[in-house]
């Protein structure tokens, strides 16, 4: 064997160069496809040789194993040159001194990038010529993914068959002619020039032998080289694309010379390479090296080594040839190099053209990850879902995870800008789980979020990734100090969640740590690069940075520049994009911001230069921003369908609507009232459309109370007193004392009653029969006390009269008692109660009467009490006794007998005594019928019909409204129809919102959830419902969009139908048209790079309705009937929320704010203020310094709120001007508006 054979060395995988210096001395070789992976220990003196080796070569017959290790040096060790890495061979790599110590080695770079530094074992073996040939040369390329659970056993059987075949060949003396070792041994003695010409590569000029000895070519090792770290500067290189002519190819090394695979079709695994016994190399550790039906592609670049950081003692080059696969994705540099060289492969060795086109298309638009995943479905996802993650990611979320993992692998930062509701939080959590499970990177990570969603993030971590230790860093200074106990202890926590305010307050603490990942939620608020917050966060030490936002593109592109510079403070080098000097603020403004802002503000159509600028901007942003809309993933999310429901006004609504419009005050307000008058009119008309009770309540009718007419006549007192005092004897008789009761004498027998009447002796009493006297009655003696005789005479007469009246009273009482008789009598009732005794057979012994005492007598049911009679007539009273008299007067006896006091005996004040109270009250007060609540409103009539059908079909409903009083009416409506519901309004506490939403989502018995559109959107997820009703539209369309997203978001499994109620032929129909016009106008404004088209020059406000595609003129549909359901087109892109060109000027804003504050109800204004307060609580974290105090009271419409917050004049001492005096001419009108807006524009005059 020649000396060159002994000096032949093999290039070890580039993973050695990416080893962590802290992990020196620890080796591990992972093989996830097999359970019996071989491992080598650190003990170099261990004499035990592993059964199988990862890399085998034939040298001098020795079986020594060289285990090499090299620390990580991403700058000085490697350099990216297209698809190759230039490595420096040193004595640490190859211990044999016969090989040049400074021999540069050119290595082809694998498609994947090293994602995480790891310490790996490297095994180098030398075998004699008589050693066993490598059986891996016969491994087939797997075509399909194995789904059988016995995959390992089948692979083991296949390996055994291949080894037996090789052993049989060696015993026969033939050996394995296709072995890599055989080919290497045959080419070992040839010079490098001969090898290059033999395999079809041109020899570079001036390059020949190295140090007088020919260079050696490395064998096609079974360990595929891993990618190396990129360098910060591009190395100047001489790039030669070397093709392989067909006539010079060694046919013994082509795939056609390989034997037919012996593996059954069902055992083929796509994307994996079967190694040897119990060894399967998975895609996570190495790239597959063979494809069934694919030709091996040999491509070598020869590049001069000029890197200053790499120590170089010679000019030699070692060319390493590696195999690539047609099915695997190549990196961007490879595709670009092939396109630049213009190389075309021969028919036998070129890629499949269709697959190349798909790969290049995916690289040109890396945003469409779903399509790319579909094309790569044969090889499966490149990043597996972390095993610690609970639940299953959706396909587009899996694509987002792969994109985030690729950012980590490529040492890049990025912006995840998915639309709200697509799960940016869960994708971020999955990324951290992937780093922990697959990369061994457990943190520590820093997540900065708004204050209102800190607990939401913590709940999401506990729900989906409970294996992570999460620290929620918030509270006062003392609480935060307690939470910092063990701050620097390893594995105390892996993720720290805090807010923007706290991270600034404790920046000296956060700045000391070296964070693994720094993630900013709602990062679109960090857009002012001059702010202290932006500069503070920029100074934090973090390996990677990730921004989460739903609106990455704001009003101007300079805000986007702030985000991109935050990700890449050092600018973008030539290895990432063609734009050099990106970090230059001035140049970026000149290149992109100024042309785009000019095109948008002027409304002119974009010229070719501007469109080219937009294309360059898109090219710049694609590698760093991932943006998916719901319309793009609608195949994975349930569909969303919007409908407009036109409702007819009821008779009462139409009467009130027409009556209000015909008022003179209404005409005056519309003509001379300004904004305040117009807004007041609109609000009143909207109240009529929502429900007439909001405009005018149905009255509760009562009788007219008046004094009694008889009181005005003086003789009435005398006549009443004479009538009441006429029968003195009867008046003094107590009815109860004499037994004058209807039902009090039923215990008396009829025999006793008749006996009393027979033996009545009332006429036998004294003075019973008074003798008739003729003539005049003698006058009573005078009461004269002047003489004894006259006094005694008067006294005798008085005693006689008293005795006479006493006997008359006794006689009348006795006659009354003897004359009473029962209605039925005890004899009759006893006869009825004992009636069953007569029906008994003669041979049955008669039972005691006490036995039947427990039974109700049959006649008792005919005798009902007053409460029972009142209850039986309750339905009649409720239905018909509803008309009170027109007028009532007080009782005359109250005025006739002023000295009498009302009776207040406890027995009379008992509610059971007054059985006719309900009927008497209804005769006095007439309440509106409960059913009129529904029949007075056309919207409620339509809602009743739709809810009835939806409930029968098993749907669940959300009802949103702007007005709080409408929620009260909806509560009465739902209670009247028997629907179970929950209510959420602006007065609901933030901590109670989560409880209500979870109860609704978990309890399917709750049919309806009614909520105010201003109840706040933080933490509200109502995916339990699949139908959304907008009873009325909010002033701010963004509030309605948030309400839609509460049901149509992650977790929704059914299609969502959205119904918007509109009263036909009213002001609501015009408001809907204006909303559609604004939606289409906003759709044309900076949406996902849509700076295209010349709509800006030809679309106007009038043309947008009817002429613009997407708007249907529904006026003719509801012209005759006045009702119906119209389907509208769901917008494919979200409406821009912050657009300067659509915002009104300051004067209009102030007028609108004042008008809404005046005309809205106090409950609605309070709900709006609370919702605005929640928004301001988050926005305060992004405000920089105190605002300048204006000289006048400024009133602005806040973002995402229907009602603006008005400033009271008393707070600042200013006086808000009134607009009672209207200008008399156009000039005065213009001057008035200019004077009002002068203070607003004064800061911009300079």
Curated annotation (Swiss-Prot):
Residues 226-255 have a biased composition (Polar residues). Its main location: nucleus. GO terms for biological process: chromatin remodeling. A motif (DEAH box) lies at residues 521-524. Residues 149-166, 320-331, 338-362 have a biased composition (Acidic residues). Component of the SWR1 chromatin-remodeling complex. Belongs to the SNF2/RAD54 helicase family. SWR1 subfamily. Residues 1-53, 60-79, 109-188, 202-292, 314-381 are annotated as: Disordered. It catalyses: ATP + H2O = ADP + phosphate + H(+). Catalytic component of the SWR1 complex which mediates the ATP-dependent exchange of histone H2A for the H2A variant HZT1 leading to transcriptional regulation of selected genes by chromatin remodeling. This is Helicase SWR1. GO terms for cellular component: Swr1 complex. Residues 405-570 form the Helicase ATP-binding domain. GO terms for molecular function: ATP binding; ATP hydrolysis activity; DNA binding; helicase activity; histone binding. Keywords: Activator, ATP-binding, Chromatin regulator, DNA-binding, Helicase, Hydrolase, Nucleotide-binding, Nucleus, Transcription, Transcription regulation. It holds the Pfam family Helicase_C. It is found in: Nucleus. Residues 27-52, 167-178, 363-381 have a biased composition (Basic and acidic residues). Residues 939-1092 form the Helicase C-terminal domain. Its EC number is 3.6.4.12. It comes from the Eukaryota. ATP binds at residues 418-425.
